[in-house]
């Protein structure tokens, strides 16, 4: 079980650590997702009571905290927002996104773990990211002013619910592309609950206040989307069966073990040349 806490910048680190100690000792919490003040990461990483507790932050300088050395137990994790940003750009075909895609596909720092995701509780669901280009948050009561305006989404030709076979087929293909990219990336993949079978919030990207069908997971959607649900299961099984997709070290893109080929390489139309410019 992971608990999410927000400690605003300026919160005394001693107080924040006391809060974490209470939840860890009293309720045996496995870890914490901590947002707000990322400077707490260094203090928490040195805390004896939290040495085996998973501590996930939005961002921090792991190289500085550990001085470039691999810790004996990697309990710090990065909620990899950069992954979501750049992989979504590549998924919808944005110009100049290929180089960033290849970087985030193989990124796995020595000092800490990275949690890769394409959707989480803050923003569009995965299905909505291929079905909506605009947020639809009027029901939240804030005149559609809440929620992010930069969602990096593409509706595949129609906004929201549609009966057009071509649009629906393209959305399914994009969902499969997204899951396959996630499952072939180094690091730890995170699938937001319901995304494994195409759950939708009808374009609401800030549904925390919707205690109704908008914010709930529609478990019946699994029966309506059996092809995609089966694909997700197969992609997870494929990842588990191939250790190269979740190695202990970040690929270097060179043949440093003298096997006759690099540990990872990228190719385009010409096998001998990797073109990193997509237009």
Where are these regions (language model features)?
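The substrate-binding groove and active-site-proximal loops of carbohydrate-active enzymes
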Residues: 2-14, 28-35, 87-90, 157-171, ...
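Catalytic cores of secreted or luminal carbohydrate-active enzymes
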Residues: 223-265
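Acidic/Ser/Thr/Pro-rich low-complexity tail/linker regions in eukaryotic proteins
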Residues: 215, 272-278
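Extended hydrophobic/aromatic segments used for targeting, binding, or gating
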Residues: 201-233, 237
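Conserved alpha/beta catalytic core and glycan-binding cleft of carbohydrate-active enzymes
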Residues: 28, 40-193, 197-198, 206-210, ...
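Substrate-binding/active-site clefts of carbohydrate-active enzymes
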Residues: 1-27, 40-44, 49
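Structural scaffold positions in well-ordered secondary structure
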Residues: 23, 34-35, 55
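Alpha-helical packing segments of well-folded alpha/beta enzyme cores
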Residues: 12, 16-23, 171-182, 186, ...
């Amino acid at each position: 079980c992971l608990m999410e806490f927000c400690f605003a910048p300026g919160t005394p680190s001693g107080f924040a650590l006391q809060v974490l100690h209470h939840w860890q000792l009293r309720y045996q919490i496995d870890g914490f997702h901590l947002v707000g003040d990322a400077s707490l990461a260094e203090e928490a990483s040195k805390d004896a009571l939290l040495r085996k507790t998973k501590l996930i932050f939005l961002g921090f300088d792991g190289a500085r905290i550990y001085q470039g050395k691999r810790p004996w137990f990697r309990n710090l994790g990065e909620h990899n927002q950069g992954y979501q940003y750049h992989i979504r750009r590549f998924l919808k075909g944005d110009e100049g996104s290929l180089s960033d895609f290849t970087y985030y596909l193989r990124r796995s720092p020595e000092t800490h773990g990275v949690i890769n995701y394409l959707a989480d509780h803050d923003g569009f669901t995965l299905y909505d990211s291929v079905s909506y280009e605009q947020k639809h948050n009027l029901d939240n009561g804030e005149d559609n002013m809440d929620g992010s305006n930069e969602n990096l989404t593409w509706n595949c030709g129609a906004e929201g619910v549609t009966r057009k076979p071509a649009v629906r087929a393209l959305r399914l293909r994009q969902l499969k592309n997204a899951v396959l990219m996630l499952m072939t990336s180094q690091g730890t993949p995170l699938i937001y609950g319901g995304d494994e079978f195409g759950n939708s919030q009808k374009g609401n990207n800030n549904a925390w206040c919707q205690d109704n069908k908008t914010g709930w997971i529609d478990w019946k959607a699994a029966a309506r989307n059996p092809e995609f649900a089966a694909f997700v299961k197969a992609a997870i099984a494929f990842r588990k069966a191939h250790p190269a997709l979740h190695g202990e070290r970040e690929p270097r893109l060179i043949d440093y073990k003298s096997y006759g080929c690099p540990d990872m390489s990228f190719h385009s139309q010409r096998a001998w040349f990797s073109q990193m410019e997509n237009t």
